[in-house]
Amino acid sequence: MKWDQNNPEKVKDFIAKMKQDYAFKKAYAARRAWEFYNHPDVAGMCYVAVGGLDSITLFLFLRSIGIEVPGTSVSMLEDRSIQKVHKALGIRALRPANGPKDRPYTKIEVIREHGFPVLSKEIAGKISLLQHPSEKNATVRHAIMTGETGAYGGYRKNTRMKMSQKWLEKFGGPENEKYGTNYQTAPFKVSDLCCYYLKEKPCNDYARSSRRFPYMGLMASEGGRRQKALMLNGCNYISKDTKRSAPFAIFTRQDILTLALEMEEYYQEHWQEFKPITGENEDGSLLYGDPIHLETIVPEIYGEIVRDPLEMTEQEIDAYKAEHNGAEPEGQLRTTKAQRTGCSMCGFVVHIESRPHRFDRLRYTSPGEWEMWMKHICQDENGEWYGWGRVLDYIGVGWEDDLFDDTAPKQLCEDCVARLGKDFTMEQPAEACNEKPEKGTCWSCGRKRCVSKYYATEEEPAK
């Protein structure tokens, strides 16, 4: 990564903060949140962009330290269990941006209009340019195909603008005539614009109309573009055009789950202070209903936050205590169901997920919705209906076989059996119980390992 080499001191300082203990990070987050709130260019005019568990935790954390600002979300994109929490906390629901029919886009409409969000936001954007050639994007398309930039890019070669050869083989077909290649052309549109129309533009429009600036539950530990932006700009970024705060920038997944448990306690003590929004007055002010008590702030889609047994030798425990002033080590926190959530129709990075991937899990929780998303989103020129199933087939991701199918048990390695056993009850066919593991490809992680046949019988392990 060249960006970290060009900014070594910033990155070094940020990483040092990420390595601090939880107490330091929590106090640091509070300090940075207040600094943003009190900045003269912000002057307390803030809101919280709320989505899943991370930002729900942020909303409650800010309230717990005395920062009482509104929360907003395009809740219709979230799982129903997340919508339930949003409603009880008084999160303001925003609508997606308007589409061609002069009404808010639906999730299906944005895919039909623009294309499937697949691989990654960056790659999808490049594929979309190849699928929609114009004189204006000719230079960028050339860089995507060859890695060569024009005058604006300094006439460089072998730049990161070039799409990987693997995906050029699949999506570079529209440029075959120009470059004398024989790449494939995808039988579906690809786009990186779903997030923009469904989430980003509604939030930007709200920020502009309300003149408020966002707190966001972003963490550098999530990697990708977020990591780069947060490491270079820090928790608070204030410029002429952009003002935003990410108090959890230095948090890890363990930190956010630890804080979520603390915010659970805070909520249960203060739940009557949160009222659902029921409508608006003629002057635009909000109407509120009676408080709704939640049994937990953790949406059902995540399951519960639990701590796994400690897996350390005595020597490792002693070393840990020596490094942490005698503190006892604890097992890792995790959620028993989904670890991350997002739009049910989003396919970004699904190609690198272990199975069961997000669409597999949707099949278990909402079979009707799964059927629709996999098979009935778009129609091709022959009138045939298709959905994510066609896209996943094209990029080599399985989706039709089912972990719960006891007539077709899956070949799984020992590590994946142990991991899946935390979420499902795993069983072996009677004839496979006495068989020795054989070398093969693991259905879940895709690695060459010693594997045995297993299938799932319940969505949670039997107790």
Predicted segments, located by residue:
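Cys/His-rich microdomains that often coordinate metals
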Residues: 350, 420, 437, 446-449
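Short secondary-structure boundary segments
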Residues: 218, 271-272
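Cys/His-enriched microdomains
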Residues: 341-344, 411-414, 440-443, 448
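ATP/NTP-dependent adenylation/nucleotidyl-transfer catalytic domains that generate, transfer
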Residues: 2-14, 41-47, 241, 253-268, ...
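Short, non-ligating residues that shape and space the ligands of small metal-coordination modules
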Residues: 352, 422-426, 451-452
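ATP-dependent adenylation/nucleotidyltransferase module used to activate substrates
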Residues: 2-255, 260-262, 413, 425
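Short metal-binding segments enriched for Cys and/or His
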Residues: 443-459
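Short linker/helix segments within small regulatory modules
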Residues: 334-338, 427-440
